[in-house]
């Protein structure tokens, strides 16, 4: 009989505005896991952005206190949600991160404009650039706090996984825009093994 208790788990979909996090969330979010999302709260309760963000934050804190599984999306351009993940780690949570970025914030600006044209929510251009820069700087801390971390470059039509952390082993895969040195600078990891992370034929 197995008496090992499963750790509570957080799945976080992170990355700058316009990188394509929501698409990853739709595909990879476990249907049985509660999803805490400010945009959905805003839509369901018809409240403003600030109230939705505050409600989402309170909900995450409640789940954390109760040691319940949950997943959420975040730009992770400030330390607020990073601090939440650190506290979760200290409480014994298993943290799985899917980090989605692009090679150039201009791509993010274009995608947000396309999203707005289709009826989606807007983010001011200057905020996209500022958050992109702040988010990229925090990537090493995201990698450090995660038990499993996948980083995808989503600049092209097909996402390309450039990095994977699992059980304190680190793997990378190169493409035109991302070579080992650049991936090392992004993640803060120098001791990485090259591996086909994209199942190319």
What are these regions (language model features)?
Residues 1-7, 63-64:
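Phosphate-binding P-loop
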Residues 16-17:
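The conserved Walker
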Residues 21:
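Conserved lysine of the Walker
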Residues 24-70:
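Conserved substrate/cofactor phosphate-moiety recognition/catalytic segment
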Residues 37, 74, 99-101:
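Residue-level recognition of beta-strand->loop/alpha-helix junctions
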Residues 141-201:
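NTP-dependent small-molecule kinase module
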């Amino acid at each position: 009989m197995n008496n090992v208790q499963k750790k509570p788990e957080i799945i976080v979909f992170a990355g700058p505005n316009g990188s394509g996090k929501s698409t990853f969330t739709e595909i990879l979010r476990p249907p049985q896991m509660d999803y805490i999302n400010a945009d959905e709260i805003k839509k369901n309760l018809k409240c403003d952005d600030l109230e939705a963000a505050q409600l989402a934050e309170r909900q995450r804190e409640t789940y954390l206190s109760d040691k319940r599984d949950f997943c959420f999306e975040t730009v992770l351009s400030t330390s607020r949600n990073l601090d939440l993940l650190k506290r979760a780690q200290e409480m014994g949570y298993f943290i799985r991160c899917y980090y989605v970025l692009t090679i150039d914030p201009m791509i993010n600006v274009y995608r947000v404009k396309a999203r707005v044209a289709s009826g989606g929510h807007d983010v001011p251009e200057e905020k996209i650039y500022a958050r992109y820069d702040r988010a990229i700087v925090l990537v090493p801390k995201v990698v450090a706090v995660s038990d499993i971390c996948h980083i995808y470059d989503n600049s092209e039509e097909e996402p390309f996984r450039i990095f994977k952390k699992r059980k304190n082993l680190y793997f990378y895969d190169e493409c035109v825009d991302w070579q080992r040195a650049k991936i090392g600078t992004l993640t803060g990891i120098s001791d990485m093994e090259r591996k086909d992370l994209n199942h190319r034929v």
